[in-house]
Amino acid sequence: MSKRKAPQETLNGGITDMLVELANFEKNVSQAIHKYNAYRKAASVIAKYPHKIKSGAEAKKLPGVGTKIAEKIDEFLATGKLRKLEKIRQDDTSSSINFLTRVTGIGPSAARKLVDEGIKTLEDLRKNEDKLNHHQRIGLKYFEDFEKRIPREEMLQMQDIVLNEVKKLDPEYIATVCGSFRRGAESSGDMDVLLTHPNFTSESSKQPKLLHRVVEQLQKVRFITDTLSKGETKFMGVCQLPSENDENEYPHRRIDIRLIPKDQYYCGVLYFTGSDIFNKNMRAHALEKGFTINEYTIRPLGVTGVAGEPLPVDSEQDIFDYIQWRYREPKDRSE
């Protein structure tokens, strides 16, 4: 998944950008995931609010905006800034850790270790490539490209290449491009492809060739340019749309391809389509109805709370039907 969220271009873009910056600090520096989730949820809710927010009290009426976040909104609206963020930006260690985590492959712990060794900038990283693993070196190599959002038009062209090449190999393959793209987003951070085939189920033996054949085909047509990692069920790499001429090359983009057993495919499609908050709400509703859902299965809960056998699923609609929830099109899941 993409490391960066799109800058907000909504009525309340200043507020949502502030909350996203706070969220990233809590995740990357403080490693306080509960605060990260709280800021992200508030940012997501405010981004969809159809009016310009004039006070923290107004924001607090929205689900997911508590007293502390409302106070920060009041301060931001009154002064145009936030003291906490100013302090974070002025703290060399915090800002360096936050920056390094934007490099694909560098997580918060690795970033802190690098900063402790005095490595704080892209230039520092380039001088110390021997300290980086293969994944991180590729992240550094394409840093500027990976920072750019992928316009929907480009994603549609990328999708055409992937789906056409997959069907050429074997019409029985099923592939879906998930993430915010499937929810109709105007731009994406990366490309997340789910893949399945009738020959691969949760009961059968592993079928890594089903994934590797697709990767090799996409390399053959020069769509996949680099490999970050290639396992039995997941490929992580880099892709690039072919261009008409060398002068107007498309940026390199991150791509993940996951091979999922056919009987678990639609639970996977639902999960990887998101959004995170929509998934949490759906899981909570499922529990109320006596089911447990994850990225693999939906299972009924017995009276003791122990999950039973996975239920058969042949579409996303089946999952909604089991938990008696109105079906929501992917475009209506961006909570």
UniProtKB/Swiss-Prot annotation:
UniProt effect for mutating residue 191 to T: 50% loss of activity
Residues the record lists as binding a 2'-deoxyribonucleoside 5'-triphosphate: 149, 180, 183, 189-190
Catalyzed reaction equations: DNA(n) + a 2'-deoxyribonucleoside 5'-triphosphate = DNA(n+1) + diphosphate; a 5'-end 2'-deoxyribose-2'-deoxyribonucleotide-DNA = (2E,4S)-4-hydroxypenten-2-al-5-phosphate + a 5'-end 5'-phospho-2'-deoxyribonucleoside-DNA + H(+); 2'-deoxyribonucleotide-(2'-deoxyribose 5'-phosphate)-2'-deoxyribonucleotide-DNA = a 3'-end 2'-deoxyribonucleotide-(2,3-dehydro-2,3-deoxyribose 5'-phosphate)-DNA + a 5'-end 5'-phospho-2'-deoxyribonucleoside-DNA + H(+)
Active site (UniProt): 72
Region DNA-binding, annotated ranges: 183-192
SUPFAM superfamilies for this protein: DNA polymerase beta, N-terminal domain-like (SSF47802), Nucleotidyltransferase (SSF81301), PsbU/PolX domain-like (SSF81585)
Residues recorded as bearing Omega-N-methylarginine in the entry: 83, 152
Annotated residues for binding of K(+) 2: 101, 103, 106
Residues that, per the record, bind Na(+) 1: 60, 62, 65
Binding site for Mg(2+) 1: 190, 192
Record EC number: 2.7.7.7, 4.2.99.-, 4.2.99.18
BP GO annotations: apoptotic process; base-excision repair; base-excision repair, gap-filling; DNA damage response; DNA replication; double-strand break repair via nonhomologous end joining; homeostasis of number of cells; immunoglobulin heavy chain V-D-J recombination
Name under which the protein is recorded: DNA polymerase beta
The organism of origin for this protein: Rattus norvegicus
